[in-house]
């Protein structure tokens, strides 16, 4: 079958016909419909992500962790034709968090991640999967279901934020978040998904970038009731919550003195390409104002399931928005080029594995 592979730690990507040695015991056969592309995939292609590794016994790694698939051969839980999305991280099998299904909090670091670390991904025509790692997607969601994996990370981060902010009464006098302002740094797919989730929670949302919005970004932020702000022109923000999806300290640190008392900062984006100074005065401000700062990565199966409910809500509440987030579709043969460099105006590019069937 065709698959899109890399050979960590080397740079490069190729479409290749492969044969795998995989056990079928208890597994479900899933045909890949769409593969989403993200910065992690491109980091693997460039060789920048040094933690990438093939599965034992292989000298290559099949890419793919953002996936929408269709069950070909099921079991009692899943039937042929069901749309499914796989959970990315698989536990180490030894720490308590992993044994309790919270491999997103693995304490040993010996987890695997499909298409990233030690396990083949889903950028292939078909894959076998343990049903406990599959999440069913309603057929009415259709292709927008490919957004579930990135959304699961958003759900996890905001669930953590709500839990941690119980340290004080942070809701408004009507028990909602309607009096709170969230600034989301970055207007890529993760930034927009955070913005939609925060709007669903009742926050006033400002999507911030250091450039003007594209037409699609402008339309989406308008339609979800958020505001797009070019931070190179405006410096008067006073957020209660900052969500950084950019990974650039130079975007986050200057905002810290403006965050309101008892506020929170979620660090989600990573780049590893920039250094920025945090002064003693800024640290004092964080201490004196009870500012919470935490990082968040990956998600549990429960976060995926909660994400399904949000996608269903948004498809009805914001008609056309999820569809517009998928800004480009490419064939399998075109995939290497878009994996090497970002498409201009991209929010989410997907590889359509069904294109050859039409």
Curated annotation (Swiss-Prot):
Cofactors: Zn(2+)
Q: How is the cofactor bound?
A: Binds 2 Zn(2+) ions per subunit. One of the zinc atoms is essential for catalytic activity while the other has a structural function.
Which residues make up the binding site for Zn(2+) 1? 38, 65-66, 149
Q: Which reaction does it catalyse?
A: D-glucose + NAD(+) = D-glucono-1,5-lactone + NADH + H(+); D-glucose + NADP(+) = D-glucono-1,5-lactone + NADPH + H(+)
Binding annotation for substrate = 40, 113, 149, 153, 298
Q: Which cysteines are joined by disulfide bonds?
A: none
EC number(s) from the headed UniProt entry: 1.1.1.47
Any idea what job this protein has?
Answer: Catalyzes the NAD(P)(+)-dependent oxidation of D-glucose to D-gluconate via gluconolactone. Can utilize both NAD(+) and NADP(+) as electron acceptor. Is involved in the degradation of glucose through a non-phosphorylative variant of the Entner-Doudoroff pathway.
Protein name, per record: Glucose 1-dehydrogenase
């Amino acid at each position: 079958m065709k698959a899109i592979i890399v050979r960590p730690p080397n740079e490069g990507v190729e479409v290749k016909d492969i044969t795998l040695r995989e056990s079928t015991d208890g597994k479900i056969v899933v045909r890949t419909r769409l593969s989403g592309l993200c910065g992690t995939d491109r980091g693997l292609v460039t060789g920048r992500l040094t933690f990438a590794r093939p599965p034992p016994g292989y000298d290559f790694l099949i890419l793919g962790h953002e996936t929408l698939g269709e069950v070909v051969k099921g079991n009692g839980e899943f039937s042929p034709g069901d749309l499914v999305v796989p959970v990315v991280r698989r536990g180490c099998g030894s720490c308590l968090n992993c044994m309790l299904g919270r491999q997103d909090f693995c304490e040993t670091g010996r987890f695997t991640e499909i298409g990233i670390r030690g396990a083949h991904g889903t950028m292939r025509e078909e894959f076998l999967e343990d049903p406990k790692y599959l999440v069913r997607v309603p057929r009415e969601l259709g292709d927008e279901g490919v957004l579930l994996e990135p959304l699961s990370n958003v759900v996890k981060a905001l669930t953590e934020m709500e839990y941690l902010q119980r340290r004080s009464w942070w809701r408004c006098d009507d028990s909602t978040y309607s009096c709170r302002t969230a600034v989301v740094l970055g207007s890529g797919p993760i930034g927009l998904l955070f913005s939609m989730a925060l709007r669903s929670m009742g926050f006033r949302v400002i999507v911030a970038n250091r450039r003007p919005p594209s037409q699609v970004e402008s339309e989406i932020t308008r339609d979800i009731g958020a505001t797009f702000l070019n931070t190179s022109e405006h410096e008067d923000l006073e957020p209660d919550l900052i969500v950084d999806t950019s990974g650039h300290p130079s975007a986050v640190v200057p905002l810290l003195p403006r965050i309101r008392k008892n506020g929170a900062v979620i660090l989600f984006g990573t780049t590893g390409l920039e250094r920025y100074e945090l002064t003693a005065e800024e640290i004092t401000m964080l201490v004196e104002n009870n500012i919470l700062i935490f990082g968040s990565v990956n998600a549990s199966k429960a976060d995926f399931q909660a994400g399904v409910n949000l996608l269903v809500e948004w498809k009805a509440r914001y008609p056309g928005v999820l569809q517009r987030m998928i800004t480009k579709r490419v064939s399998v043969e075109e995939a290497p080029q878009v994996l090497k460099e970002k498409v201009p105006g991209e929010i989410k590019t997907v590889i359509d594995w069904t294109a050859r069937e039409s």
